[in-house]
Amino acid sequence: MIRQEVLHAVLDPKAVHFKQFWLSSVDRDESELLEVLCFGNYGDLNAIQSCEEWKDAIESKLRTLTLLGLCEVPSELEYDQAMASCCIPDDVILEQRMVELQAQVHFQLDSVGRRIKVLRCLGARDIYNGERPLLLLRDAARSRESTLAGLRQWKQKLQYQLR
């Protein structure tokens, strides 16, 4: 049984962090849903077997979370890449989704060039640190190890540029 506060968070368009719910979850269906919301992407939507009555809300949330994840790294994002990752059918819907992320991401849309220039990403997706076993996902794209590896690469790049 999915807790009411979890459902409210899924339905809240501004909510992007679900790890606190995942860590305290004891229900298998709820844990699977929260695992995908925390660490999965739009492509993992079909892994969730329960929650049919909220499928549209969950699908919408995963699109938003996947876009946020794409904005964490690059300074420029092609429309085609974002649309393919989130299964978004047209430019207008993509631009609407980006506007929904304004509190998390500062960006400029280039509708003609079909690019999103990420100026600053204020939010980030949840990070998996092995707190409990994953039930559905083979591995989490954003884990402690991958975050540390990215920081080490960034440090080396900065050190190289300063030489």
UniProtKB/Swiss-Prot annotation:
Domain PCI: residue ranges: 5-120
GO cellular component: COP9 signalosome; cytoplasm
Source organism superkingdom: Eukaryota
Subcellular location per the Swiss-Prot or TrEMBL entry: Cytoplasm; Nucleus
Transmembrane residue ranges: none
Main location: cytoplasm
UniProt keyword annotations, A-Z: Cytoplasm, Nucleus, Signalosome
InterPro entries assigned: Csn9_fungi
GO annotation terms (biological process): cellular response to pheromone; conjugation with cellular fusion; protein deneddylation
Function: Component of the COP9 signalosome (CSN) complex that acts as a regulator of the ubiquitin (Ubl) conjugation pathway by mediating the deneddylation of the cullin subunit of SCF-type E3 ubiquitin-protein ligase complexes. The complex is involved in the regulation of the mating pheromone response.
Assembly mode: Component of a COP9 signalosome-like (CSN) complex.
UniProt name for this protein: COP9 signalosome complex subunit 9
Organism: Eremothecium gossypii (strain ATCC 10895 / CBS 109.51 / FGSC 9923 / NRRL Y-1056) (Yeast)
